[in-house]
Every structure is written in C-alpha cells, then in structure tokens.
C-alpha cells in the first residue's frame, strides 16, 4: 500500500519541476487547475507580470448547480467552459496547462477538454 505522505511528496516534486519549465515560456500565460476536498479552482496567471488574469471556481454564486457535487467531473467540465469564456473576454487565447503535478486523467482531462472546446489553445 502506498503511503499518502510519499504520494503527496512525489506529486509536489512533479509540480515544482513542471512549474519551473512552464515559467521559462513567458510568451503564454499559465492555466492553473487545482482541486481541493470540496471545490475546483482554475486561474490564468501571467508569470512575466505576476498578475492573475482570469479566476474561476465552483464556489462562485453564479456557477451552475450540480446534483453530484462541486468537485465532480461534470463540475470540472462546466468550470472549463466558464474559464474559456472569461479568457475570451480578457483577450487570452493561448495558454499552457499547469496541472499542479496531478495525472492528466478524470477531472483534469474533463476540464482541459471543455476549455479547448471553449476556444482556448494549449
């Protein structure tokens, strides 16, 4: 059985390694996806200026209600659509996905696919 501490340490090391490489490409902002025990968040960050351009979360009042929860795969799909819409309004079309060291599977894949369908390129 895998120790949770070791699993989390490996994820954090992957996240730092990936973020270092992503910060080297300053021509595109980072699309950061994060999941907590209750909610999902996403933000687009311009590392050159150190500014958050777009922020969206399942905690917002205008976020569509889901029968399962605010951290489900369907909520991740809706969050991808919301982020893509806000990015269009902010004038952002190309981003780099920062998955915070997590495996590209499940909620992250659903979020990324719906953001691509919404018009973001990465």
UniProtKB/Swiss-Prot annotation:
This is Large ribosomal subunit protein uL18. HAMAP family: Ribosomal_uL18_B (MF_01337_B). InterPro entries: Ribosomal_uL18_bac-type (IPR004389), Ribosomal_uL18_bac/euk (IPR005484). Pfam families: Ribosomal_L18p. Keywords: Ribonucleoprotein, Ribosomal protein, RNA-binding, rRNA-binding. GO terms for cellular component: cytosolic large ribosomal subunit. SUPFAM superfamilies: Translational machinery components. One of its GO terms (biological process) is translation. It comes from Leptospira biflexa serovar Patoc (strain Patoc 1 / ATCC 23582 / Paris). Part of the 50S ribosomal subunit; part of the 5S rRNA/L5/L18/L25 subcomplex. Contacts the 5S and 23S rRNAs. Belongs to the universal ribosomal protein uL18 family. CDD domains: Ribosomal_L18_L5e. The keyword Glycosyltransferase does not apply.
């Amino acid at each position: 059985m895998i120790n949770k501490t070791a699993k989390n340490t490996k994820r954090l090391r992957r996240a730092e390694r990936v973020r270092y490489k992503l910060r080297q490409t300053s021509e595109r902002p980072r699309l950061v996806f994060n999941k907590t025990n209750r909610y999902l968040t996403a933000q687009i960050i311009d590392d050159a200026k150190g500014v958050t351009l777009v922020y969206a979360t399942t905690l917002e009042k205008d976020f569509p209600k889901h029968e399962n929860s605010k951290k489900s795969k369907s909520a991740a799909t809706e969050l991808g659509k919301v982020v893509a819409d806000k990015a269009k309004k902010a004038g952002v079309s190309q981003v780099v996905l920062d998955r915070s060291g997590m495996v590209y599977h499940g909620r992250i894949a659903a979020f990324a696919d719906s953001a691509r369908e919404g018009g973001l390129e990465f």
